[in-house]
């Protein structure tokens, strides 16, 4: 791998022994060996992935060649039917894109009665009546959620709601009466 001979390796070992000493040299050798193992495994992994990608690419290329060859070997009837299907699909795409999506939705939700013929001609010229006013519902306030509350507080909250409803009711002005005087 590094193209190092035995004498060169022995020289590196002796220099390492002198520089690091006998106690730190085994730890340094283990560390360097771990780095070399990690680099080798990384290189092997990259090489395997590249070969897999190349094989996959070759396989895809061969599949494309086979598909082209099989399409060229089709009978004229099959080619004609494939062309018809393509044309039908293209015309469907064009008609769908030409139509307004809302109009297509309205048409899909329209019920056509084949028994009654000329239904549209009978109602030709008739316009629907327009409403002068629209109906509306009175506003409703959400009721408070009732949890495990004692009945005394529950009746108090009901009384508060009733008082709130009464205060929301229109007040009719009246003339002062004798009961208002002290």
UniProtKB/Swiss-Prot annotation:
Residues 168-182 have a biased composition (Low complexity). It is found in: Cell inner membrane. Keywords: Cell inner membrane, Cell membrane, Membrane, Protein transport, Translocation, Transmembrane, Transmembrane helix, Transport. One of its GO terms (molecular function) is protein transmembrane transporter activity. Residues 88-107, 121-182 are annotated as: Disordered. It is a single-pass membrane protein. Disulfide bonds: none annotated. GO terms for biological process: protein transport by the Tat complex. InterPro entries: TatB (IPR018448). The Tat system comprises two distinct complexes: a TatABC complex, containing multiple copies of TatA, TatB and TatC subunits, and a separate TatA complex, containing only TatA subunits. Substrates initially bind to the TatABC complex, which probably triggers association of the separate TatA complex to form the active translocon. Belongs to the TatB family. This is Sec-independent protein translocase protein TatB. It comes from Salmonella typhi.
